[in-house]
């Protein structure tokens, strides 16, 4: 599993020189400029490092039972297939799993990624390699995310995971 990206560096320095009120939009913009693997790494680190505070907000408002079948389906896959599913979701590739994910509510998508990170920690889903070191750009996005207040963090995470997958009902 290879995670690399330095492509968003210049956008980062420009994006985070903006006022605090624009911090949410800037963080989202730079996150979306990361490579797919770096996006997945940032989500994993965000959920594992900040998961204790994210969990109540995500699962409290979500109907996670709607995503349980999808999570169980992913658990049954090989690690290579699991990684491909996550990449397909982030890249908005039109697959059966991406379409199933696409019909979930934004809060359920937020909870889905939290549960996926928990499954990674428990070894049911392909983990981030133990020797993995997040890219400079990914690290900057993660630090920017940590610098936001709780409500802003949830807004950023909800927006980035809401944009993943494919909405089968969209025109």
From Swiss-Prot:
Its main location: membrane. GO terms for molecular function: chloride ion binding. It holds the Pfam family Carot_N. Its cofactor is 3'-hydroxyechinenone. The keyword Membrane applies. It is found in: Cellular thylakoid membrane. Belongs to the orange carotenoid-binding protein family. This is Orange carotenoid-binding domain-containing protein. It comes from Nostoc sp. (strain PCC 7120 / SAG 25.82 / UTEX 2576).
